[in-house]
Structures are given as C-alpha cells and as structure tokens.
C-alpha cells in the first residue's frame, strides 16, 4: 500500500487531533505541522517528535529562542507532501489556497471556510466514493457533520424527505478564553434558517432542511433536537437497530448510564478516553420517538473531535485511495478507537 505524505497547517483544536490521527494510519505519514506561535501546543508537538514548521522564516526565530527546533517554512513543507490539511482559523484557508495550488498539493479544508474554497464539501457516510480524486475537499463543520451522519444513515435505510433541527451550540471551546457568551442565550443567528441547513445542502442538495441555532454558556458539546420525515412509516425498533449498527453513531441510554447531559458525557469520557474526545455522534436512546414517518431525537456533538475521522477519510479521498467506504471506515475508526460505548 502506498503511503500518502501529509502536512497539517495549523495545530489548534482540530489540527492537533488530525495530526495525531494521521500518525496512527498505516497508509499515511505526517511530514510536519505548521505553528505560528511557540506556545504549549508547540512544546507538546516537539515532545512527541512531530516536525514543526512555521509560516515564514520570521516566526522561526522565536521558536529557536525557546529551544524548539524548526524544520522549515510552510513553503518547504508543501514541497515535501502530497496532501495538506488546512486547519487554520476561519477564512485563512482561502488565503492559503493560492500557495497550495502553486505547490501542486491536494487540499483538505475545514468547515469554517466557505464552500467555494474546495471542489466539494465532504462527509464520509454521504459522499466518500464520489469525492475520490478531487483536488480539494472541505470537511463540513462539527454541527453539520453530526447532522449528516444521522441523515445519511437513516436515508440509506428508509429514505429521508425533510429535516427540521434546533441546534444548541456551545459558546466556546475550552481553550477559547476570549469567546462567549458567559451569561446569556444568544440567537446564533437571529435569522432563520441558520447556516447549518445551507451547509448540509452542500453535500445533499436535494434535501428539504431548515435549522435554527442558539449559543449557550458551555464549552463541552453541542446538542441538537432533530425531527426527520422519512419516505415510509417505520417502527421505533427499526430506527434504534439502524442507529445501533451504524458506524460513527453511539446510542447512550440515560436509564442504563444515568447520563442526561453533555457534562455527564464528557465526565464519562474522561474516565476512558484521551482528551475526553467523543468522535462518535451521540444519540440519546430514550429520546428517540417515532410516529409513522416522523422521527424525533436528541443528539450530542463533541465539537473538538467529531470531524477528525472525516478529515482522515478526506485525505484518502483526495489521494485517490484504493480503500472502499467500508475499508476506510474500518481503518480510520479502528485506529482512532471509535466504538459503540463510552468505555
């Protein structure tokens, strides 16, 4: 099996997780990561033996002063890789694109970028095979990834005609000390539908979907209430069986575990998972309600880690990997430890 050489531009919440995930793949090699600031994350990368590059030679001076070895600049990294994963702050990826194209590398962008940055938006369970061979892909946002995992799973089994969803979004990631809110529930945005419906349609353009969102003062996870209209009547048992057997979806029983909140999910993950990451979509089992063709449920999205598996699959897709959908799911999920329970 040929090995794809990958560079990660950005070592923040998503970038660091994607970089570490790459090191666990048999068909990929992490050539290096790009860091702008010689902070604790850079020290961690250095301690793990991850080659560090800087945007330009100017930033390298500060790294060297702190004893952090620098392997070169972003341009030099691009000359050594087949694929670059752009995990820079929102909007920066579009600014970086000309540099990537000049270097002739395939690109994987994040959901904070506008869809136009890439040839297609990407979600593994929805369009992995169709995305193979693209020059660039945009992995949709954490919320959209959660919605698409659910929608494409149920659509494959029953057909989905329409979706209505209310998203309760975390206000900030744990390390984002300058974001909020800290004592408010904020319409995010105040207009309807929210951008999440538009984002879903970049992958499923045929879908009738409307979304609304608010931001709340928590850092743990997002929570969605989703109502789906299916193509045919179903029984609750059928829906639960489908979700229980689907990849990257975890059913959590509040009755069996006592878990009724995002904070309890994270607390449980702290007992058994590195960084308390939950890359699976969590569906609360008792919340699943079925009435003919209508399915309602609550689901939770760990915004720091849910897109990591999709990034790995997107790398394979742009690199024209010979792995099928089932094979990439097995390789990615097995290496990252995705499973059906928190423990």
From Swiss-Prot:
It is found in: Cytoplasm. The active site is at 142 (nucleophile). Keywords: Cytoplasm, Glycolysis, NAD, NADP, Oxidoreductase. One of its GO terms (cellular component) is cytoplasm. One of its GO terms (biological process) is glycolytic process. NAD(+) binds at residues 13-14, 112, 170, 303. The lineage of its organism: Archaea, Thermoproteota, Thermoprotei, Desulfurococcales, Desulfurococcaceae. Pathway: Carbohydrate degradation; glycolysis; pyruvate from D-glyceraldehyde 3-phosphate: step 1/5. It comes from the Archaea. NCBIfam families: GAPDH-II_archae, PRK04207.1. Belongs to the glyceraldehyde-3-phosphate dehydrogenase family. Its EC number is 1.2.1.59. It catalyses: D-glyceraldehyde 3-phosphate + phosphate + NADP(+) = (2R)-3-phospho-glyceroyl phosphate + NADPH + H(+); D-glyceraldehyde 3-phosphate + phosphate + NAD(+) = (2R)-3-phospho-glyceroyl phosphate + NADH + H(+). This is Glyceraldehyde-3-phosphate dehydrogenase.
């Amino acid at each position: 099996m040929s090995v794809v050489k990958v560079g990660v531009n950005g070592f923040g919440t998503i970038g660091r997780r994607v970089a570490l995930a790459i090191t666990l793949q048999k068909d990929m090699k992490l050539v290096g990561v790009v860091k702008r600031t010689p902070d604790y994350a850079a020290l961690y990368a250095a301690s793990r033996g991850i080659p560090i590059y800087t945007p330009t030679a100017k930033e390298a001076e500060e790294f060297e002063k702190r004893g952090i070895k620098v392997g070169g600049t972003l341009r030099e990294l691009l000359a050594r890789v087949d694929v670059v994963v752009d995990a820079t702050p929102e909007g920066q990826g579009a600014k970086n694109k000309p540099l990537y194209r000049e270097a002739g590398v395939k690109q994987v962008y994040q959901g904070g970028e506008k869809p136009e940055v890439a040839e297609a938006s990407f979600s593994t369970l929805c369009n992995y095979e169709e995305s193979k061979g693209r020059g660039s892909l945009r992995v949709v946002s954490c919320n959209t990834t959660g919605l698409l995992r659910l929608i494409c799973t149920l659509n494959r089994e029953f057909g989905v005609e329409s979706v209505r969803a209310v998203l309760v979004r975390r206000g900030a990631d744990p390390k984002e000390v300058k974001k909020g809110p800290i004592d408010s529930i904020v319409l995010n945005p105040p207009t309807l539908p929210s951008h999440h419906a538009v984002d879903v349609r970049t992958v499923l353009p045929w879908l009738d979907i409307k979304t609304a969102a608010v931001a709340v003062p928590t850092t743990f996870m997002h929570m969605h209430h989703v109502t789906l209209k299916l193509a045919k009547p179903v029984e609750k048992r059928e829906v639960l069986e489908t979700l229980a057997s689907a990849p990257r979806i975890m059913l959590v029983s509040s009755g069996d575990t006592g878990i009724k909140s995002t904070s309890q999910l994270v607390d449980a993950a702290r007992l058994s998972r590195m960084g308390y990451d939950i890359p699976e979509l969590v569906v609360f089992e008792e919340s699943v309600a079925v009435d003919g063709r209508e399915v309602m449920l609550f689901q939770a999205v760990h915004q720091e880690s849910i897109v990591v598996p999709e990034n790995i699959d997107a790398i394979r897709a742009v690199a024209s990997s010979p792995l099928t959908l089932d094979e990439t799911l097995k390789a990615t999920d097995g290496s990252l430890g995705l499973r059906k329970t928190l423990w």
